[in-house]
Design a protein with these regions (language model features):
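Mature catalytic domains of secreted/periplasmic carbohydrate-active enzymes
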Residues: 37-496
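Short, aromatic- and cysteine-enriched interfacial helices/patches
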Residues: 3-4
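Bacterial N-terminal signal peptides
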Residues: 19-32
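Short, low-complexity intrinsically disordered segments enriched in A/P/G/S/L with frequent Arg
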Residues: 13-15
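Intrinsic structural disorder/low-complexity segments
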Residues: 17, 32-34, 71
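Generic short amphipathic/hydrophobic targeting helices enriched at N-termini
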Residues: 7, 20-22, 477
Length: 496
């Protein structure tokens, strides 16, 4: 994957290869999350300290599971299939009549998420196709009207809470099934154009004709009714993941959703819920809690108006969110672990997606990837949980990432490319002890004056340290070196 600069909600210099693989949601997100440079409006009275406390569990836990599940698991070609191919309404209705994930076991999902080291989970209660995974009284287009007949959302929250995980709801602002949702550039009913992914160039005069019998006011009320259901009938909801706003051109803005009214409703029902940034309230200071770079790695801690913000990278195992039977682009174990470490090393979270198949199970490939996370987090979890970006005075050697635990004053060196020899670090005079995290074995270190190979030079004998690593990489993916820093107020680390 490539690196990009993320500043004020914009991503600079994406590669051509990256642009070719963007989904519509990413495309719209990158082009619409522009931040006004004027003083932001405040919708609520929460102080920064209160917000920090509200998000404290989330910024500590760092790692979550995204679950994209719905009718699109049957065609097994991704969650945007109705838009991208496109699939006719008649064909998609057939998936509704056939939907019966009879091997679904929310307890199995929850156990696998917990074993993988994930601390929270977010389920697609409704994706863009409009199909609802709960027994909503405001639509017939719901899971309880399929052959399956069970409330998946209820089983999800009960199972994940039982395993001690926080639970969240993804809710699509788009709805391709609702008769009042107006047709726009991201709607399967848009005028057909020459190219499959060509949205621009459609004449504005086409849309009033297409939408003459549609009423967004009625759809807005439908959304609010459903959000009220989700935030009233399922107990405490920890995260609300709304998706998405795309104003240009012939799209939808925050006014189409009445995002302010929607967020006020959310806060009135669940004051402690954490909400992402995709409702389009970019000119506010508190219309969102965290930003959501999708399927790319940031090169530095994201900022808005020059200030660092809470953020969460959302990533997939293979490039698709919904189940994709024939995907050939599955990431390696090392790549997946690096995504987690990379997010934490830049002060953020990672939510990694699983797309269950049409039987309701995680397929074997997904299970193997979750097991890879499980092996790594069991041994190295303390290098991500409660960790953040290292202080600037610590420079990451080439081929490594650094994470830092403020409470224990520990620095962690993640060896993405094993050096196969001594590792030179520029950590000043702060190293007290060094060891591999996976087995606790000591790593000897000594002070040196220079390292021409890494273009590191110090005169006076301070700053450079040589860690004596074994010549062969330990039998673990992405080994981690724990550095206990000198701090008279920090007790020696106690192994659990």
């Amino acid at each position: 994957m490539r690196f990009f600069k993320y500043e004020n909600g914009r991503v600079s210099r994406p590669s051509s290869r990256f642009l070719l693989t963007l989904t519509v949601s990413i495309f719209a997100y990158f082009h619409t999350f522009t931040i006004a440079h004027s003083a932001p409006r405040h919708l609520f009275t929460e102080t920064p300290a209160q917000k920090s406390e509200r998000l404290s569990w989330w910024t500590h836990d760092r790692f979550g599971m995204f679950i994209h599940f719905g009718l699109y698991a049957i065609p097994a070609r991704g969650e945007w299939i109705k838009m991208t191919e496109p699939v006719s309404d008649e064909k998609y209705d057939e998936y509704f009549r056939l939907f019966n994930p009879n091997l679904f076991d929310a307890r199995d999902w929850a156990r696998r998420a917990k074993a993988a080291g994930m601390k929270y989970a977010v389920l697609t209660t409704k994706h863009h196709d409009g199909f609802c995974l709960w027994d909503s009284r405001f639509t017939d287009y719901k899971v309880t009207n399929t052959p399956f007949g069970r409330d998946i959302v209820r089983e999800f929250v009960e199972a994940f809470r039982a395993e001690g995980l926080h639970v969240g709801f993804y809710y699509s602002l788009l709805d391709w099934h609702h008769p009042d949702f107006t047709i726009d550039m991201c709607h399967p009913g848009r005028p057909k154009m020459a190219k499959k992914w060509e949205f621009y160039g459609t004449s504005d005069k086409d849309f009033p004709t297409l939408n003459r019998n549609r009423d967004m006011a009625r759809y807005r009320q439908y959304m609010k009714d459903q959000i009220r259901e989700l935030l009233t009938n399922y107990g405490k909801v920890d995260i609300l993941w709304m998706d998405f706003t795309y104003p240009e051109p012939n799209g939808k803005t925050h006014l189409d959703w009445d995002s302010e009214g929607l967020l006020r409703l959310v806060r009135s029902l669940q004051p402690q819920v954490i909400v992402n940034n995709r409702m389009g309230l970019y000119d506010t200071a508190d219309g969102w809690d965290f930003v959501t770079p999708e399927q790319f790695k940031v090169c530095e801690w994201p900022t808005v108006r020059g200030e660092r913000v809470h953020w969460e990278a959302c990533q997939t195992f293979s490039g698709k969110w919904g189940y994709h039977r024939d995907a050939m682009t599955w990431k390696s174990d090392a790549e997946l672990i690096e995504l987690l470490v990379h997010s934490v090393s830049k002060g953020g979270n990672l939510i990694m997606n699983v797309g269950p198949n049409a039987r309701g199970e995680f397929d074997d490939r997904a299970k193997r990837k979750l097991e890879a996370y499980a092996r790594w987090t069991r041994l190295n979890g303390e290098s991500v949980y409660g960790c953040t970006q290292a202080p600037e005075r610590f420079r990451a050697p080439d081929g490594t990432l650094l994470t830092y635990a403020p409470k224990t004053h520990r620095l962690f060196i993640h060896l993405l490319c094993y050096p196969g020899k001594d590792l030179v670090v520029d950590f000043g005079d702060e190293i007290s002890f060094a060891r591999f995290l996976h087995d606790g074995s000591e790593i000897k270190f000594s002070q040196i004056e220079s390292c021409p190979e890494n273009k590191l030079y110090r005169h006076g004998g301070e700053g450079l340290w040589q860690l004596s690593l074994p010549p062969l990489q330990p039998d673990v993916v992405n080994p981690v070196v724990e550095i206990i820093l000198k701090n008279k107020n920090t007790l020696m680390h106690q192994w659990q």
